[in-house]
UniProtKB/Swiss-Prot annotation:
<comment type="function">
    <text>Antibacterial peptide, that adopts an alpha helical conformation which can disrupt bacterial membranes. Each caerin displays a different antimicrobial specificity.</text>
</comment>
<keyword id="KW-0964">Secreted</keyword>
<protein>
    <recommendedName>
        <fullName>Caerin-4.1</fullName>
    </recommendedName>
</protein>
<comment type="similarity">
    <text>Belongs to the frog skin active peptide (FSAP) family. Caerin subfamily.</text>
</comment>
<keyword id="KW-0878">Amphibian defense peptide</keyword>
<dbReference type="GO" id="GO:0005576">
    <property type="term" value="C:extracellular region"/>
</dbReference>
<keyword id="KW-0929">Antimicrobial</keyword>
<keyword id="KW-0044">Antibiotic</keyword>
<dbReference type="GO" id="GO:0042742">
    <property type="term" value="P:defense response to bacterium"/>
</dbReference>
Amino acid sequence: GLWQKIKSAAGDLASGIVEGIKS
């Protein structure tokens, strides 16, 4: 559903931020 899509997008965003901090 919509909530699953929101959670998925939030997870992708968080992963991107973490990768940005690491590098």
